[in-house]
Amino acid sequence: MSLHIMAMAFMLCDHLWGTIVPGNDWLTCIGRIAFPIYAFLLVEGYFHTKNLKKYVGRILLFAILSEIPFNLAMGSSLFYPVHQNVLWSFLISLGLIHWNEKAKQNGKIWLRCLVGGISLLLGYVVGLITMVDFYHAGILTVLVFYFLRQKKWWSYAAQFLCLWYINWEMLGGFSYELQMFGQTRFVVRQGFALLALFPIWLYRGQQGYHSKWLQIVYYLFYPLHLLILGLIKFL
């Protein structure tokens, strides 16, 4: 539960910056932490759900419900075809994860490696073509947590390196100039996403307090806060 609440709070900060409180960069810096946590929770949800069809169905339902609120908040329009909400990113990712799990059942190492490699390529291409939130980088982030789920020191190191490359090199973007020891250094704003690894690594796979109503709140938060922010922009 704590990871969900953290992710919701960080996402709200980022969306406040992107809609009604521009210029407060600290909001988007800490907001970068949200997506990797959600990506991690998506993978955990895949493995812990009691009914995969219902799990995917809920995400699909809220992806549809969130589209207009997302368009209003991020595009100031009911129709915003150049950017889709993050739940579509998650649906694509779940499809690729499920494909890999089916390949695992076959038991052949070569097939698992082949499907894994094709999944990374498909995630990259489909993420760009569909223009889902975080594009190719978002889907690859989910796959990083899927392929490196072993909770070993080497998987943690690989997660760090992969997320560093995805956020620092692949996404890049705006950077802050720092003076350190007489040298100029640049810190990429998107790089703050790596801070998400600390609470993720502390996760021990134990579910906290859970209820049906709390689950509904988690899902409703995304479209509702976007709708509110989108409407405030027009006031």
Identify the role of each PLM range.
Residues 1-235:
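Alpha-helical transmembrane segments and their immediate juxtamembrane cytosolic regions
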